[in-house]
Amino acid sequence: MAKPTTIKIRLNSTADTGHFYVTKKNARTMTEKMVVRKYDPVARKHVEYKEGKIK
C-alpha cells in the first residue's frame, strides 16, 4: 500500500485557550509548519493557529 500524500494535522491556538482545529495538508508540497489565522471561539477573536501533532 502506498503512503498517502495528505496527512491530518492539528492546528493549536496560540491564545492558550486549548481550542484546536483538525485539517489536512499535502506533506510533499507544504514541508514547513502551517500557521493560519482563524477564529478562536473561546477567546472570541481571530488568533494564529500553529501546526501540532494529533495524539
Swiss-Prot record:
Looking at the Swiss-Prot or TrEMBL record, what is one Pfam family this protein matches?
Ribosomal_L33
Is Magnesium one of the keywords UniProt gives this record? no
Source organism, top-level taxon:
Bacteria
Q: Which keywords accompany this UniProt record?
A: Ribonucleoprotein, Ribosomal protein
Q: Which GO terms describe its molecular function?
A: structural constituent of ribosome
Q: Which InterPro entries match?
A: Ribosomal_bL33, Ribosomal_bL33_CS, Ribosomal_bL33_sf, Ribosomal_zn-bd
One cellular component term (GO) for this entry is: cytosolic large ribosomal subunit
UniProt record, GO biological process? translation
Query: Which NCBIfam families does this one have?
Result: PRK00595.1, rpmG_bact
Family, as annotated: Belongs to the bacterial ribosomal protein bL33 family.
| Classification via PANTHER family | 54S RIBOSOMAL PROTEIN L39, MITOCHONDRIAL, LARGE RIBOSOMAL SUBUNIT PROTEIN BL33M
The entry's protein name is Large ribosomal subunit protein bL33
